[in-house]
């Protein structure tokens, strides 16, 4: 029989223990930074009909707060990973590369595949090693995700940035928004704690589930979303280590709940709130056209603002441009600058183009976690025509023949490019220090 002293001691121990379901206070987003959306992963189809992808788990640095860089992890970049868009019936081949200093795996959360390629703890890829997996997609449309699953370091690797989305695209016609990054929006919600404005998992780790005091959406601190006055589809992932979310709109308006973890519902449901456990996904459609002029936010049940949403009117000044043949992504600041994720290599030809052939290039100044900076983009050996900026007709001072276009963070332009001579030409940012730091590429023009 337990004596009185033991009983008193155990009672005190239980009193001092933190309850497993206790919620750490989460601070509201101040809505200072526009969210950015993960890039869509590019694939190449081989002669056997497989869509080929490459995913690298790698180390990086992320500027969550101005002039404060955190050590982070990402897939094919500094933080998070690209979105893989698949369809039912696709045959898929993915080269998985571990560029970390520790073991990792690549787990396809929610994907129905053979256990040999599921990416569980037994399917370790060691540092510096790689392997290729194959599978066929046998599921209907759904929002899934991928993340590491190495024992015992899953929590640490996910917290530090290893997460990405995987769509199985709509196979049946429906009226749901489907323009990725415009009205079909991936929303990865996470909570983290920053120590002196830097990530430090070891100092914030909790064995009963690490919860943070700062909300991030798609890796952005103090996020906000600006969207047109139309229906928008939010593909919500609770990518937190341990925090449950109970999401609703701040104006208490209802929305359509259209899909759960495994895919679309037979019939959409009108709801005013949804629960999201860690790793859970749900899709909702919000009709912003019915909320003109309103300040609305996606909030957690304790009124914590997760994502302020502001409306912008539909633009009537759209510019119709031909199909894009080349995409240029300008990224970074200081010496962390790249074009399409690459530093300049004199032995690498990035693009080719035929002599006298008109092509449309899309130039994007990718906004980073702190907003980024303006980049003047220059092409050697040609004068180009600016067709559009952010989908609209270019401003008057961007018309006429040009060889430099300067883009603000987040801006995207389409330009018409024709080369009248053959040879190898440079394209680069014309901030000279950025050029010297590798923000440059090469195009070869041939007959």
UniProtKB/Swiss-Prot annotation:
Cu cation 1 binds at residues 107, 378. Residues 1-25 have a biased composition (Basic and acidic residues). InterPro entries: Cu-oxidase-like_N, Cu-oxidase_C, Cu-oxidase_fam, Cu_oxidase_CS, Cu_oxidase_Cu_BS, Cupredoxin. It is found in: Cytoplasm. Its cofactor is Cu cation. Pfam families: Cu-oxidase_2, Cu-oxidase_3. Residues 1-29 are annotated as: Disordered. Its EC number is 1.-.-.-. It comes from the Bacteria. PANTHER family: BILIRUBIN OXIDASE, CUPREDOXIN SUPERFAMILY PROTEIN. Its main location: cytoplasm. The keyword Electron transport does not apply. Cu cation 4 binds at residues 375, 429, 434, 439. The keyword Metal-binding applies. This is Multicopper oxidase mco. It comes from Staphylococcus haemolyticus (strain JCSC1435). Keywords: Copper, Cytoplasm, Metal-binding, Oxidoreductase. Cu cation 2 binds at residues 109, 147, 430. Cu cation 3 binds at residues 149, 380, 428. GO terms for molecular function: copper ion binding; oxidoreductase activity. Binds 4 Cu cations per monomer. GO terms for cellular component: cytoplasm.
């Amino acid at each position: 029989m337990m004596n009185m002293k033991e009983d008193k001691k155990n009672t005190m121990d239980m009193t001092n223990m933190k309850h497993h379901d206790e919620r750490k206070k989460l601070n509201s987003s101040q809505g200072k930074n526009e969210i950015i959306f993960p890039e869509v992963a590019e694939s190449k189809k081989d002669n056997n009909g497989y869509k080929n992808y490459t995913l690298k788990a790698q180390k990086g640095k992320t500027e969550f707060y101005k002039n404060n860089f955190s050590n982070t992890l990402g897939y094919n970049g500094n933080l998070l990973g690209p979105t893989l868009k698949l369809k039912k019936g696709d045959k898929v081949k993915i080269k998985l590369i571990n560029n970390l200093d520790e073991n990792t795996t690549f787990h396809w959360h929610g994907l129905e595949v053979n256990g040999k390629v599921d990416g569980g703890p037994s399917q370790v890829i060691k540092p510096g090693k790689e392997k290729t997996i194959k599978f066929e997609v046998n599921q209907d449309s759904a929002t899934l995700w991928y993340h590491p699953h190495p024992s015992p370091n899953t929590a640490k690797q996910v917290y530090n940035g290893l997460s990405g989305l995987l769509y199985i695209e709509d196979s049946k016609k429906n009226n749901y928004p489907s323009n990725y990054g415009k009205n079909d929006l991936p929303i990865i919600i996470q909570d983290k704690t920053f120590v002196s404005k830097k990530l430090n998992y070891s100092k914030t780790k909790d064995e009963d589930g690490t919860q943070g005091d700062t909300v991030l959406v798609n890796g952005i601190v103090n996020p906000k979303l600006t969207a047109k006055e139309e229906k928008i589809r939010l593909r919500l992932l609770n990518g937190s280590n341990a925090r449950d979310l109970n999401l609703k709109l701040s104006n208490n308006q209802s929305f359509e709940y259209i899909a759960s973890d495994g895919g679309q519902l037979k019939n959409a449901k009108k709801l005013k709130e949804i629960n999201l456990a860690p790793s859970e996904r749900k899709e909702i459609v919000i009709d912003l056209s019915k909320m003109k002029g309103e300040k609305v936010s996606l909030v957690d049940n304790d009124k914590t603002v997760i994502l302020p949403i502001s409306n912008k009117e539909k633009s009537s000044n759209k510019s119709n441009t031909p199909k894009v043949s080349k995409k240029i992504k300008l990224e970074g600041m200081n010496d962390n600058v790249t074009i399409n994720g690459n530093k300049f290599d004199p032995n690498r030809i990035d693009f080719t183009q035929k002599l006298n052939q008109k092509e449309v290039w899309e130039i994007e100044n990718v906004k980073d976690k702190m907003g980024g900076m303006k980049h003047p983009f220059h092409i050697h050996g040609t004068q180009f025509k600016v067709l559009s900026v952010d989908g609209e007709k270019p401003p008057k001072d961007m018309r006429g023949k040009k060889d430099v276009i300067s883009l603000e963070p987040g801006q995207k332009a389409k330009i018409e490019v024709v080369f009248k001579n053959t040879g190898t030409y440079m394209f680069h940012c014309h901030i000279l220090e950025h050029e010297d730091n590798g923000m440059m590429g090469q195009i070869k023009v041939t007959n």
